[in-house]
């Protein structure tokens, strides 16, 4: 056995599309047939995968979510030179070069773990190997079920192809497909994954809620839920208000914040009239937009106004999005910046520059784009890359035309040619961290505006000639405000140090591990009668603990009243810990549910073991550092309480009233446990 630890409306639309993908399922729908075993008879396969099972949380094998499967290697694999196989694997997965696998299942697990981490180094680390008769059982940490299953078959087919060159196998193509499928999964969005990882790194419980299509951090009354940075604790009306660009503009102007003058129009003629009233240059943009789509800047003539208006209408027709009007506003000159607040406090500032190429006097613009995409290692179609690939589309061609250029133009040596009007990072724009140089007055402006909204993550897009100068010095204008903005860009700027905004957001809610948790007691044979007695004791210790949840063989009970019993044990645990009023939780996990479902939650303050079998004994691994194990010895007539290091006390066991004896044994430790969590509230 081995156990190894090795954005604006645009933002809202992005969140909406992400949520629609997730609706009703924790898996992305895609065809993965090409990744599954080939149609050859299974008896002819050299690496056979069987009995794949997924646990959504801690289980008998691992202290976290795990995919478990049996694997069998044919004699041909066993007889193949092991070192040759290792070197072939390491060639494709160079991060494994310094690993020292001791046998085939170890090598398979290491390769699979590296595939599951992908090129983006996902935060997964553990696997466990055991022997099951002639087969091996491998348990490995995972995020998305379909991606993990397909990755397992990928590695099995890969091993098969490495020892049998006649078997065709395109590793690079299949690995790329795995990564693309992960990007489409519920875990794959850069912002949501960064928040998941930020929680896990801080030992904050993180679980996916498949029915809701969102994630939960923390338990019970300490929990928050959401997708991307749109969270249940945010004000729904405030979040909605930020999607109305025209109303936001009026509000900011009323408050005296620097916002360009403008108006919302609903036809081409009025747009032209408003532009003439404001004076050129002007900007046209849709009231409801996405990632700069439909935005036209630097408009200098009435003809260009009509063209920009028609482009917006065409965009709505093409995408099927609802037309809510067009904003015509004064043009503000300056560099594009994203200013971010977390919990009302300034967090980060990013300067964004539109995609461009630098001329060499030899190549034309189309060739320069290809050279930039091919040679700049920071550019990738991976959504987590600091720079996206530059894509040539109609927007690029039209903007070049305004500059009296086209794709065949050969720029002068050293000439900088911008390809887009808008500094869109996902379209090849460049991001630069300017958090350290922003003027204090601009920081105060961010916090002043954020203070009007009950929104945790709040972004302000501004144009400023120099962000290190105060906003009232001129050349500064607020373009729009955003609730639920993307925050991954701050973790991976193209220039400058990263700012851990996901970590800031987690720290805002959970300054300590205890602020994410509630008291939890688990056991292998807890009765409803014991839970009801415990509830009375807890309320006696702290009358504020008003909502008590228990899970026994009878099902879920809240405050002693039966609530429901789901056929799946892990769903029962999830339902109970999902309750936003839950103060205290007690759960019974016996051998059958541990094998079939795992226990879902992580960490416990007290583990109560009553004649445990080998599976139930695994509950001890969930004991928190300050926790206790309570052993009931029926044959000796005693109850022993232990911490992580030693025995603390023994109590006599009344066989006729076991529940009362058990409650007496744990009662001395309950006040400190309750106080630990009650003194660490979650921030709002």
How should these model regions be labeled?
Residues 226-391, 439-440:
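Active-site nucleotide/adenylate-binding loops and adjacent lid/helix of ATP-dependent enzymes
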Residues 218, 274-276, 340, 469-473, ...:
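Short glycine-biased active-site loop of nucleotidyltransferases that positions the nucleotide triphosphate
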Residues 2-198, 345-347, 353-360, 364, ...:
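ATP-dependent carboxylate activation and anion-phosphoryl transfer catalytic cores
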Residues 535-683:
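ATP-dependent carboxylate-amine ligase catalytic core
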Residues 265-271, 465, 570, 592-594:
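Short acidic loop-to-helix transition motifs that present clustered carboxylates
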Residues 518-539:
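Glycine-rich phosphate-binding P-loop
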Residues 368-429:
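Extended, charge-rich helix/loop segments that form flexible
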Residues 140-277, 290, 526-527:
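Conserved N-proximal alpha/beta basic substrate-recognition cap immediately N-terminal to
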